[in-house]
Curated annotation (Swiss-Prot):
The lineage of its organism: Eukaryota, Metazoa, Ecdysozoa, Nematoda, Chromadorea. It comes from the Eukaryota. Induction: Constitutively expressed. Not regulated by heme level. Heme transporter. It comes from Caenorhabditis elegans. Belongs to the HRG family. One of its GO terms (cellular component) is lysosomal membrane. It is found in: Membrane. Glycans are attached at residues 44, 144. GO terms for biological process: heme transport. This is Heme transporter hrg-5.
């Protein structure tokens, strides 16, 4: 019985919007520090590019979480959610393809994972998975809110 209570509290903690906001802010800060380290120290331009993209997508995620917390996301248009969903799904699949291609090229050309300086496609591929995570998370959030908008819209039409 107590394990069910503790697991539900744990889920409540990690699913709470404040926790998601804090983790997203932490990811944005990690992204900025990695952008600087890839540019200044390691000169890994492909990983730098994808890190910058992840940071931008994380900023968009933060915007959605803050709108959810302030309950202003309910004022967004249905079409906005559809655009967010389809753009993020497309970007997620492109990033997933980038991940696969980077890992195949890194494996075939025998790039060492431990070699941090210069181009290292292992790191580029890892950042592509982060893009996939954030874009699909945004797409699911947009889909949930678009479904709620559609249900509310149909209830308003039925009442009229």
């Amino acid at each position: 019985m107590s394990s069910k209570i503790s697991s539900s509290r744990c889920c409540t903690l990690f699913c709470h919007v404040n926790t998601r906001i804090a983790l997203t802010i932490l990811d944005i800060l990690i992204g900025f520090s990695n952008i600087l380290s890839y540019a200044i120290q390691f000169h890994n331009w492909s990983a730098l590019t994808l890190t910058a993209m992840v940071t931008l997508v994380a900023c968009h995620t933060l915007q959605m979480f803050l709108a959810e917390k302030k309950n202003t996301i309910t004022h967004w248009k249905y079409s906005t959610f559809k655009w967010i969903m389809w753009i993020d799904i497309t970007l997620g699949f492109l990033a997933l393809g980038c991940f696969v291609v980077c890992f195949i090229i890194a494996g075939v050309t025998e790039i060492e994972f431990t070699n941090l300086y210069g181009e290292n496609l292992w790191f580029t591929g890892l950042w592509a998975t982060a893009i996939t995570k954030y874009t699909w998370q945004n797409a699911l959030l947009a889909r949930n809110y678009s479904n709620q908008k559609r249900i509310l819209k149909s209830e308003i039409v039925e009442d009229a």
